Amino acid sequence: MFKSLDIQEHMEVVGSDGKHIGTVDHTEGGERVMLTKDDSKAGGHYHLISIEWVDYVDRKVHLNKPSQKAMLEWQTVA
């Protein structure tokens, strides 16, 4: 089991299919992960994902859902 403290700034975030969806900007209260707005997938906006989507953390943050589903469900922050 990972801890939210295992998630570090600038880590790559990938879906369960191994495809890149973003880069960690920071975590919020141990409940959400903010992705950077400068990433190629971000379209110039920050995005929030639930910490519950995280399956495990090594050098990357691996989600428990495919990249397309995660990008459809993430919260865009203006």
Task: List each model region and its residues.
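Peripheral interaction segments used for macromolecular assembly
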Residues: 1-78
